[in-house]
Amino acid sequence: LPGMAERTVILYTFSKKFAMTGWRLGCAAGPAEVIDGISKHNANIESCSNHFVQMAGIAALRGPDEPQQGIVAELRRRRDTLVDRLLEIDGVKVTRPETTFYLFPDITEVYQRKGYQNSTEIRREALEKTGVSFCSREHFGRPLPGEDKVFVRFAYSGIPVDQIEEGLERLAAFWE
C-alpha cells in the first residue's frame, strides 16, 4: 500500500520458528528514525544479547528449514491437545489460535461455580492442589472497564504432550 513502508515497523523473534523461547533474541525492521528510537529505548531496558545467543540466531537463520517444520508440528500437537482437553472441562471456553504458544481460556463459569473471590486465588489453589501453573489476567495489566470475564493464560511451548494431558486431567478433576 502506498505510504506503508514509512509508517510500518516489523518485530520478529526467534521464539516460535526456532524454538528459542527465553533466549530474548529478535529484531525490528522499519524507518531508520523509528528503529533508532527503539534501539535507544531497548539499550536502557536491557543490554545486548550475549554472544552465544547471537551466534545461535545466525545459525538458525542460515540453517535448513526442515527443523522448523518439526518444531511447528510439535507446537500444533501441544496446542491441539491443550485446547481439546480444556474444552472437555465444564465451564471452560477457549478458541484454537493459529500462531502462538499461549492460550487465554475463559474460566468465568468455573470461577463462579467454585466461589472464588479473585483470580489470584484460583491460580494459587490450582497450583497447590494439582501442580498446574498458569497466569491470571492481572499478570497482563488491570482489567478494562466493564471487563467481566475471568481469563487465564496457559503456555505450552516447553511442555510435552504427555505432561499437558496429565496436568489437564488433574485440573479437570479439581475444577469439576
Residue ranges and their predicted role:
Residues 1-176:
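PLP-dependent class I/II
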